[in-house]
A protein has these predicted regions:
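Non-ligating segments of multi-cofactor redox enzymes
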Residues: 1-198
C-alpha cells in the first residue's frame, strides 16, 4: 500500500454541528435510514462534553474484512476499505465485527433480508469504473478519483475532521496537541487502553 488513508476527529474542535453528516448524505444521495457518518456526543449536556464524528475508520487490519464470508470487503492500494455490493449477501457479520458501527443496512428485520450493506467509502466509490453512473448509483460520488478529499472532511468548518494519508494527518494532529500543551494521545485513549491516571 502506498498511502494509508485514514480519518482523525479532533474532539477539541468538533462542535456537534453535524455538517459532516449532511455533506455525506447530500454528496452520496444515501437512502433514508442509512447514515454513513454520525456525530456522537459523550456526556451530552455536562460541562466538558466531547463530540466525535464517527464513520468507517478504514482499518489497516479491518475486522469486517476478516469475517465477510463472500470476501465482498477489500482494501484499495491506498488502504481504503471498500465493498462490492454485488457480492454482499446481507448476512450482517461485518456489522457485528465493526467496533465503529460503520456497516449499515437499508431495511429493518432479520439479516439476509435487510438488503445490501452500505458504509463510508472515503468518497472513493467502489469496484465499478471510476466516476461512472453505475459507481455513483451503488456507492456514491468518487471524489478521490477527482483528486478531492471526502466531502465530510472538506466541509468541516472547524477542521475537526481530518482525512488523508495517516502520516500527514497524524502530524497535523500532533502539532495541534503540542500547541495545546497536554498529552499527545487522542481523547478516549486512556479509557480504551486502561491507562487512566494513577
Amino acid at each position: 500500500m502506498s498511502a494509508r488513508m485514514k480519518f482523525i476527529c479532533d474532539t477539541e474542535r468538533c462542535i456537534d454541528c453535524n455538517g459532516c453528516v449532511t455533506a455525506c448524505k447530500n454528496e452520496n444521495e444515501t437512502p433514508w435510514g442509512v447514515n454513513r457518518r454520525r456525530v456522537v456526543t459523550i456526556n451530552d449536556g455536562v460541562p466538558g462534553e466531547q463530540s466525535i464524528s464517527v464513520a468507517c475508520m478504514h482499518c489497516t487490519d479491518a475486522p469486517c474484512l476478516a469475517v465477510c464470508p463472500t470476501n465482498c470487503i477489500y482494501h484499495t492500494a491506498d488502504g481504503i476499505v471498500l465493498h462490492n455490493k454485488d457480492q454482499c449477501i446481507g448476512c450482517g457479520y461485518c456489522s457485528y465485527a465493526c467496533p465503529f458501527g460503520a456497516p449499515q443496512f437499508p431495511e429493518t428485520g432479520l439479516f439476509a433480508h435487510r438488503g445490501k450493506m452500505d458504509k463510508c467509502t472515503f468518497c472513493a466509490g467502489g469496484p465499478e469504473p471510476d466516476t461512472s453512473e453505475a459507481e455513483f448509483k451503488k456507492y456514491g460520488r468518487n471524489r478521490i478519483a477527482e483528486g478531492k478529499l471526502p466531502a465530510c472532511a472538506e466541509q468541516c468548518a472547524t477542521k475537526a475532521l481530518l482525512a488523508g494519508d495517516a502520516a500527514q494527518i497524524g502530524e497535523i494532529y500532533r502539532e495541534r496537541v503540542d500547541t495545546r500543551g497536554y498529552g499527545a494521545e487522542l481523547w478516549g485513549w486512556e479509557i480504551a487502553y486502561n491507562r487512566g491516571k494513577k
